[in-house]
Amino acid sequence: MRVFINAQLNSMQSNPKISAETTMKQLQELMPGARRALFAKYHIGGCQSCGFDDSETIGEVCKRNEDLPVDDVLKHLSSSAEHDQKIQINASDLKKELDQEDTDIKLLDIRSREEFEAVKIPGSEIMTADLQQEALGKWDKKTRTIIIDHTGDRSLDVAAFFIGHGLNRTVALAGGIDAYSKEVDPNIPRYRIEIEPD
């Protein structure tokens, strides 16, 4: 894997509108926590037997999963997205918190070591298994913890995991380090990942 710096990445859509015709790929781009929400309630998308193809629509997935009522699934996804918003912080609000003098914030970066070493928010730490174990077992449960990834698609799951283990002041950085670079600190280079063929 190589990390490429790129100052012209497309921005993610910020106003999710979903329908039965929305593809699963579009859904996951609009609502990064959608797979988690579908699996938690309907056992869809969590494993090979209940998976879906990115090109399938929500309606098609509902039909082949016991003909689930599409409207009910859409309401559940909307409710889940609202919950996800509550455990996110946007880049400008994070900057305000970091600029406060007596702030004790832990910035945990869950990207690969290669990504982290190429581009990082000052003061952040790469999440290792040892650091995760320390955080969950030894940190004060009131510790303000920010989970950072590349574009915000994986950090929600980790934030929910930390909250589930009692670190209730944990949030995910909405849009990840990419959003932080765009909205707060243009000195942090933007990048894209390319997987080289074997």
Regions found by a protein language model. Name each.
Residues 109:
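Phosphate-rich cofactor/ligand-interacting catalytic cores and adjacent structured alpha/beta frameworks
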Residues 9, 13-45, 51-105, 113-144, ...:
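Rhodanese-like catalytic fold shared by cysteine-dependent sulfurtransferases
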